[in-house]
Design a protein with these regions (language model features):
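Membrane-proximal, lumen/periplasm-facing interface regions of secretory-pathway glyco-
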Residues: 247, 269-321, 330-353, 369-408, ...
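Specific aromatic-rich, kink-prone transmembrane helix
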Residues: 25, 76-93, 99-107, 257-260
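Membrane-interface transmembrane helices that cradle and orient dolichyl/undecaprenyl
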Residues: 31-34, 44-45, 84-100, 209, ...
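Transmembrane-helix motifs of polytopic, lipid-linked glycan transferases
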Residues: 13-40, 83
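Transmembrane-lumen/periplasm boundary regions of multi-pass, lipid-linked membrane glycan transferases
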Residues: 121-219, 237
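Short helix- or helix-capping micro-motifs
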Residues: 51-62, 107, 111, 125
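Hydrophobic/aromatic-rich transmembrane helices and adjacent perimembrane loops
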Residues: 230-233, 242-270
Length: 431
């Protein structure tokens, strides 16, 4: 970020900002929905408090609460889905049809954030085709202009894939080819358990109840929400029949689900939010102070986030200065590159051939770090091991998150090529 540089604070600054703006958009969307429907007259009489429900519920989910702090692709994705819902609600409230351009912008930038944005956008397309109100819109140029805006926003991602063998589309789309029906109950259980955890248990129940109430409504916006929710749910369930659905994939639905809570009359939504906030506090407290000593297997905050600055400091002390640090796993390479001072980091993996970073020549020497959790040795076709050194541990408050083997290695040549295209010299973090 412009004011904090490449620091943890700078990288995470836009998380809370986007969550705050997205919350305002969601509350305004709820207000417009309430004001446009006589069916909600009783609820609307409670005014602004009722419209606040979606914003409070969304921010009480563990996924969104933590997402504002740790910054994942889901953070901008949730914001753009909130912007999309706000834009559509303005259209259905009789505002200028130029809001379709903002719908297209939201859809395109949401896709750039994470490809799962296509699912609720496909739900919007289904609503346009399946309902009379939607087909009336299709007779005007505005939805088509919005689609053009979306395509323009998506164009850089598509162009990059077109010039790089469609690699990211094949990787993400290739998941649909996974098929292990014998593990269906395991995958379904993981999908259900993941949502109960990321939404928080009572908010998950609240989402289910909200969809039940949506099914009873006949107004345009309720039908639109149903399309944007049920179509992606059907895709996730179908995928879970034969393959794993990552717990964070359905987070794309959380803005629409939170908005649906407006039509739930029960007061226990406050208790649901309180439980979600309590879970958030517990997770953040564990990440910061680790009051409960858990193994990395059970403590995700320790396993993924614990002790990185101290670990890299230990690496720099124990490995000779002015030598190359090497990682053959992209997560470790990224952490080393972010925290290391005045030292080059070389990443080695097939994915790096698709990036515009400088490559290394074969024969280069350096120190390879590998997690002991991988339970294997460095690939002998890629590296010549010259020596092995004592492991270096990454820990937080004396709890060991992981241990890393340290090898002095030389990059092997692949065929007759002098340059190793599967390597990348990562840019130094200038803080």
């Amino acid at each position: 970020m412009f004011f904090a540089g490449d620091t943890a604070e700078g990288l995470r600054f836009m998380g809370p900002v986007s969550a705050a703006i997205g919350t305002v958009l969601l509350v305004q969307t709820a207000q417009q929905w309430l004001q446009s429907q006589k069916l909600f007259a009783e609820s609307a009489s409670s005014g602004f408090v009722t419209a606040l429900k979606p914003g409070i519920v969304l921010n009480s989910t563990l996924a969104v609460g933590l997402g504002t702090l740790i910054m994942t692709p889901d953070t901008p994705l949730v914001f753009f889905m909130a912007l999309l819902l706000w834009s559509v609600s303005n259209l259905l409230s009789g505002k200028h049809p130029a809001f379709w351009l903002l719908v297209g912008l939201s859809a395109g930038l949401g896709f750039d954030s994470k490809y799962t944005a296509l699912l609720p956008v496909a739900g919007l397309g289904m609503w346009l085709l399946a309902t009379r109100a939607g087909r009336q819109w299709l007779r005007t140029p505005w939805p088509w202009l919005g689609a053009m805006v979306a395509v323009i926003c998506m164009a850089p991602v598509v162009e990059w894939n077109a010039t790089h063998h469609w690699v990211s589309f094949l990787k993400q789309g290739g998941r649909a080819g996974d098929w292990q029906p014998a593990r269906m109950f395991t995958f379904m259980g993981e999908l259900l358990g993941g949502q109960i955890g990321l939404a928080s248990p009572l908010i998950f129940v609240l989402f289910v109840v909200a969809v039940k109430y949506l099914l009873r409504l006949r107004d345009q916006f309720a039908q639109l929400l149903l399309c944007m929710i049920l179509l992606p749910v059907a895709v996730f369930v179908q995928h879970a029949i034969g393959a794993r659905v990552q717990a964070n994939w359905p987070v794309v639905l959380y803005p629409a689900l939170a908005l649906s809570v407006v039509c739930v009359p029960y007061r226990w939504w406050k208790a649901a939010c309180a439980l979600g906030v309590a879970m958030f506090i517990v997770v953040v407290g564990q990440a910061l102070w680790a009051p409960v000593h858990l193994s990395p297997h059970f403590d995700m905050t320790l396993r993924q986030m614990g002790g990185w600055p101290e670990f890299v400091e230990s690496v720099e002390k124990q490995i000779p200065p002015d030598t190359l640090l090497i990682a053959d796993e992209y997560g470790l390479a990224g952490e080393l590159s972010f925290y290391v001072q005045n030292r080059k980091v070389l990443a080695v993996e097939p994915r790096w051939q698709f990036f515009a970073f400088p490559h290394s020549t074969c024969g280069a020497e350096g120190y390879l770090l590998r997690s002991r959790r991988r339970h294997d040795q460095p690939d002998p076709t890629l590296f010549d091991i010259l020596a092995q050194y004592p492991d270096i541990s990454r820990s937080r408050h004396s709890a060991v998150a992981d241990s890393y083997a340290v090898y002095h290695i030389r990059l092997r040549c692949l065929g007759n090529a002098e340059m190793r295209e599967d390597t990348a010299i990562l840019p130094a973090n200038k803080r």
